């Protein structure tokens, strides 16, 4: 074998070895993938197994509960039948009692009616009712008379109130008149005071004149006519009369308030 042939054989062998290694790697990779799939399948299987066991447990519990419900339903049906029977018996007893009570009531009413008819209690009752009605009518008439008297009293009070109101108005008018007079007197008083002051000043001036002087005598008379004390007495009298009228008005207002 020549060297070139040997060299080609070596290259071909290496190429086969490389191809074998590549195939080996692919096989290993495929084995790993298969193992991973097997692992996932086993995990899924375990999960589904657990779920199945849980569902089986739930089904068993529900089946047990269903059995209990059926048992309870049967017991309720028996109890319902018993209650229905008792109800029917009670209804029959009630109807019988009702008939008996009705008969006793009719019998009692008949006995009462016969007794009343025998001793005339019904007529006595009617007579008592008539007497009560008469008494009530008499009471109502008395109340009506009392109301009439009260109305007359109120009318009298109303007339008295009107009279007091009229007197009040008259007193108010009289008070207004007196107040106007008082104002006039106050004006005259003020004028007299001014005149008095003027005359006093003139008096000082004429003190040196003879007492028999005609002008001096005239001034003295005029001074006495306009003395302040006299005007003050008139003012005080009017003021007293006004206060009396105001007091009278206040008393009448108080009396009207009490009447209302």
From Swiss-Prot:
InterPro entries: CCDC172. Its main location: cytoplasm. Keywords: Cell projection, Coiled coil, Cytoplasm. The keyword S-adenosyl-L-methionine does not apply. One of its GO terms (cellular component) is sperm midpiece. Signal peptide: none annotated. It is found in: Cytoplasm; Cell projection, Cilium. Residues 13-194 form a coiled coil. May interact with TEKT2. Belongs to the CCDC172 family. This is Coiled-coil domain-containing protein 172. It comes from Bos taurus (Bovine). The lineage of its organism: Eukaryota, Metazoa, Chordata, Craniata, Vertebrata.
């Amino acid at each position: 074998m020549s060297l070139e042939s040997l060299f080609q054989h070596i290259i071909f062998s290496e190429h086969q070895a490389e191809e074998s290694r590549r195939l080996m790697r692919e096989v290993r990779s495929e084995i790993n993938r298969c193992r991973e799939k097997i692992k996932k399948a086993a995990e899924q299987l375990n999960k589904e197994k657990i779920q199945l066991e849980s569902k089986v447990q739930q089904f068993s519990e529900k089946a047990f509960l269903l059995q209990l419900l059926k048992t309870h339903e049967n017991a309720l049906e028996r109890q319902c039948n018993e209650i229905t029977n008792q109800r029917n018996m009670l209804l029959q007893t009630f109807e019988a009692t009702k008939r008996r009570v009705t008969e006793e009531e009719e019998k009692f009413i008949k006995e009462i009616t016969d007794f009343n008819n025998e001793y005339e209690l019904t007529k006595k009752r009617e007579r008592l009712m008539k007497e009560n009605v008469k008494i009530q009518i008499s009471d109502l008439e008395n109340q009506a008379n009392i109301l009439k008297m009260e109305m007359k009293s109120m009318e009298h009070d109303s007339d008295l109130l009107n009279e007091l109101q009229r007197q009040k108005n008259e007193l108010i008018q009289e008070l207004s008149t007196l107040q106007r007079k008082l104002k006039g007197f106050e004006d005259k008083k003020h004028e007299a005071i001014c005149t008095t002051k003027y005359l006093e000043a003139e008096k000082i001036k004429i003190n040196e004149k003879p007492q028999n002087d005609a002008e001096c005598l005239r001034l003295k008379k005029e001074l006495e006519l306009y003395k302040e004390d006299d005007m003050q007495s008139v003012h005080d009298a009017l003021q007293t009369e006004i206060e009396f009228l105001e007091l009278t008005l206040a008393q009448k207002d108080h009396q009207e308030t009490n009447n209302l």
